[in-house]
């Protein structure tokens, strides 16, 4: 029994989001299993996998030899191995790169499209889920397992949950919440990730940025104490030699269209506009506002104005504060 994604509607900002059940069709799951899974993953990603507890999840980066990210991964322990969530558009490429050296290790790396990914967010999301699961994750235990279901907790931009489960449980949850929750497609979760400052890597931006250019270090996703991993030299150089000049910015305002991942935007300089940055993700909300996540120089003045490329009207975008410090977590 396949689970059918919900029809899309315009996403809402977290501050006024009603209880919403979200199908996460633009995200995908993958796993690594086998006796060598921890050791192998330790040599592939930026975080110290050995320190990842059963009750935790973490946003980490998987880089090439030059330190450019194939993708970022929402990583957690799963069974006798690990699982991670990433954007569906990058999963095949990311898995192919991670498998390159797997022949020498006792591991199996595979996509998992049998699992269903759902988000629960908005007004009284915790209370709604408490009726269906015995234990819910929280700030102290952001990952819990309830039977066939893994639940992940997120505190930003407001409390929300990711539900990783089978099609039967997903359908049951959908049926039970149908009367009290609105349904929406994955653009709503994307809007919340933009507000949260969680970097979103889609295919056009794969293999383009070092992790620090997307604030992974501020989210606790880089260990500078662990042993060798793919891209470590360049990631370390960015920290210790100040080689990274970019960071992730959260912009909000209005635009005549929604910019696509990989596009640049325009920055106001006096009477003129100059192209800058790279869009990671953008959405238009139900109130007409445009939210965008853009990698730009990390020394920008907070009052700088921006606009969508080739914007003809008076629409502009401004910098919004991120809900976390850019210091290393």
UniProtKB/Swiss-Prot annotation:
State the source organism's domain of life: Bacteria
State if Ribonucleoprotein is listed as a keyword.
no
Which GO cellular component terms, listed alphabetically, does the Swiss-Prot or TrEMBL entry include? cytoplasm
Q: Name one GO biological process term.
A: iron-sulfur cluster assembly
Q: Name one GO molecular function term.
A: folic acid binding
Provide the binding site for folate. Answer: 27, 189
Q: Identify the Pfam families for this entry.
A: GCV_T, YgfZ_barrel
Localization annotation: Cytoplasm
- Alphabetical UniProt keywords: Cytoplasm, Folate-binding, tRNA processing
The entry's function note states: Folate-binding protein involved in regulating the level of ATP-DnaA and in the modification of some tRNAs. It is probably a key factor in regulatory networks that act via tRNA modification, such as initiation of chromosomal replication.
**Classification via PANTHER family:** TRANSFERASE CAF17, MITOCHONDRIAL-RELATED
**Similarity comment: family membership:** Belongs to the tRNA-modifying YgfZ family.
The name this protein goes by in its record: tRNA-modifying protein YgfZ
């Amino acid at each position: 029994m396949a689970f059918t994604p919900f029809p899309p509607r315009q996403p809402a900002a977290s501050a006024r989001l009603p209880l919403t059940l979200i199908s996460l069709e633009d995200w995908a799951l993958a796993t690594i299993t086998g006796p060598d899974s921890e050791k192998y993953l330790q040599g592939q990603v930026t975080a110290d996998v050995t320190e990842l507890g059963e009750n935790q999840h973490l946003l980490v980066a998987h880089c090439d030899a030059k330190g450019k990210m194939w993708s970022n991964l929402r990583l957690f322990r799963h069974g006798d191995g690990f699982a991670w969530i990433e954007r569906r558009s990058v999963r095949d490429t990311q898995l192919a790169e991670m498998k390159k050296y797997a022949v020498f290790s006792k591991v199996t790396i595979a996509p998992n499209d049998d699992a269903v990914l759902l988000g629960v967010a908005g007004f009284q999301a915790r209370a709604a889920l408490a009726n269906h699961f015995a234990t819910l994750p929280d700030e102290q235990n952001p990952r819990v397992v309830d039977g066939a279901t893994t639940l992940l907790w997120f505190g930003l931009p407001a409390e929300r949950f990711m539900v990783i489960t089978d099609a039967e449980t997903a359908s049951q949850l959908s049926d039970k919440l149908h009367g009290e929750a609105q349904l929406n497609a994955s653009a709503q979760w994307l809007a919340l990730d933009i507000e949260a400052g969680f970097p979103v890597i889609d295919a056009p931006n794969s293999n383009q940025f070092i992790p620090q250019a997307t604030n992974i270090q501020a989210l606790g996703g880089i260990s500078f104490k662990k042993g060798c991993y793919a891209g470590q030299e360049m990631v370390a150089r960015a920290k210790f030699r100040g080689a990274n000049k970019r960071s992730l910015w959260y912009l909000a305002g209005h635009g005549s269209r929604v910019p696509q991942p990989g596009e640049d935007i325009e920055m106001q300089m006096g009477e003129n506009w100059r192209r800058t940055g790279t869009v990671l993700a953008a959405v238009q909300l139900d109130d007409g506002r445009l939210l965008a996540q853009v990698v730009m120089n990390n020394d920008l003045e907070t009052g700088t104005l921006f606009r969508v490329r080739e914007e003809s009207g008076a629409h502009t975008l401004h910098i919004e504060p991120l809900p976390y410090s850019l210091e290393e977590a």
